[in-house]
Amino acid sequence: MPKLPAVGIDLGTTYSCVGVFQHGKVEIIANDQGNRTTPSYVAFTESERLIGDAAKNQVAMNPNNTIFDAKRLIGRRFDDATVQSDMKHWPFEVFAENGKPRIRVEYKGERKSFYPEEVSSMVLTKMRETAEAYLGGTVTDAVVTVPAYFNDSQRQATKDAGAIAGLNVLRIINEPTAAAIAYGLDKQGTSERNVLIFDLGGGTFDVSVLTIEDGIFEVKATAGDTHLGGEDFDNRLVNHFVQEFQRKHKKDLGQNKRALRRLRTACERAKRTLSSSTQASIEIDSLFEGVDFYTSVTRARFEELNGDLFRGTMEPVAKALRDAKMDKGQIHDIVLVGGSTRIPKVQRLLQDFFNGKELNKSINPDEAVAYGAAVQAAILHGDKSEAVQDLLLLDVTPLSLGIETAGGVMTTLIKRNTTIPTKQTQIFTTYADNQPGVLIQVFEGERAMTRDNNSLGKFELSAIPPAPRGVPQVEVTFDIDANGILNVTALEKSTGKENRITITNDKGRLSKEDIERMVNDAEAYRQADEQQRDRINAKNQLESYCFQLRSTLDDEHLSSRFSPADRETIQQRSSETIAWLDANQLAERQEFEHKQQELERICSPIITRLYQGAGMAPPPTAGGSNPGATGGSGPTIEEVD
């Protein structure tokens, strides 16, 4: 079997997308529902696990056990302020385990809990299966995207999610950079262009300034907010309508998860409508305690409710330009990416910021990131086609990285917006006489004191020979790989003693054992999903066979040929089986198959006799073969005498 190409996956907060570069062009792959983007939702029910459209479609009926927004949890600690505020909006339960958030749901009557990485891995698995259905084989290699402003922990956790999904993650790349590839791929050979990518999605916001020339994409600066997007605009609308409902009907629906979910779905739809119309209506029958909720919202009201959030998107734009040492006039193209850039007010603010300059809407904002990721996947997989062979990506690290020195001071080794991969070394020493060891504490952030920055991890370099303060020399090396993930090494020069850390468990990273366990769990869930599919198939075949028998009884050409006894037998047996089906919807596959065998053993000879007497060929059964043997798409069943 030929080696399948690597795919590019945009793992989004609200929607995900997968693309593949083949025959010199990118194909964005539609899922089994025909949609080119798939909701990043996973649901658990009494009988099955659902991922994507199927999960989102049943969310109002099953809010407690439908997980979304895993990207807002991944790589964060439970006590993170954003996690605490998000929990107020989520209908599912989030609890702390070793300082990390876990999500608890009920599946097949049992309580199960998942780390955000596991939930994201389920979405990645769905994207992988979407690609496999299109490519006709097993996909193992992928490039996965993250917001440019994701920190080290979030990147590492995303890579772990890929591993749990059974993917070999070739590279983690930044979303705006991927979008820039989608924008600039067909512009090779043109003179140098400065491009600003404005990427406002469902849950995250990034701004990147790049220079594109002759296939070289060089990121100059990046800025953003890993917790701002369409979901936040929905939240404002939901809160607004909860208050309106309280005012009008004197009822507080704030604690009713199902009502809130139905309201949120309506708000999301209204928000989209307001991008093309100036008014949207909301009509929800029996929203809460039997009260119908009919109302409307104008675009002006929506803009007022979210005014501070919309205006807040301009600060990262200014910051990225400052860091890139460019002024507004030097930007040639302003490219919009992410579904939330369809909001007219956001476009107006951005255009005003650039003194009326036209915005570039030439790329599909929902698909651009997966498109660029697919191109990068092809390059890393060794694709030699002309379109990509000269393409080079130079990205940057979004946050400054350093260590804590005496007095809790942040000493930066790698400044933000440094091109990656990169390596920096600095010599440190002891601050006390005969100090036996040093504690290397690693932080990321821009503040002067480490307490105000984000701790990534720490490790000890011990057994330093006794010496006066200032004499021992400890060489600390920071090494950032192409994924933006950090390795730190400390070396004591006189003894050659070395210690290193790929920032791991201190910052809530999953251990190797955790990941292996989750890979096994993922396989178990996949098998359970498959068994469920087989079960449904067997049930449908049995149901279909029963109704086929009934339609034969009603067939005007055949009904007169039945003897009363045969008619009675078929009528009785098919009715009994349908009644059994209604009462045993959750029976096992084998039970459905056994029932069908029993029914066929009695009814097939009657039907065959009837058709032979009429000189006609017997009809195909539910499975697609003659009565008396099932087959086709379902499980094969051998007739037993």
From Swiss-Prot:
Residues 612-641 are annotated as: Disordered. The keyword Cell division does not apply. GO terms for molecular function: ATP binding; ATP hydrolysis activity; ATP-dependent protein folding chaperone; heat shock protein binding; protein folding chaperone. GO terms for biological process: chaperone cofactor-dependent protein refolding; protein folding; protein refolding. InterPro entries: ATPase_NBD, Heat_shock_70_CS, HSP70_C_sf, HSP70_peptide-bd_sf, Hsp_70_fam. NCBIfam families: PRK00290.1. The keyword Phosphoprotein applies. Belongs to the heat shock protein 70 family. This is Heat shock 70 kDa protein cognate 1. Residues 625-634 have a biased composition (Gly residues). Gene3D superfamilies: 1.20.1270.10, 3.30.30.30, 3.30.420.40, Actin, Chain A, domain 4, Substrate Binding Domain Of DNAk, Chain A, domain 1. The modification Phosphoserine is found at residue 362. It comes from Drosophila melanogaster. GO terms for cellular component: cytoplasm; cytosol; nucleus; plasma membrane.
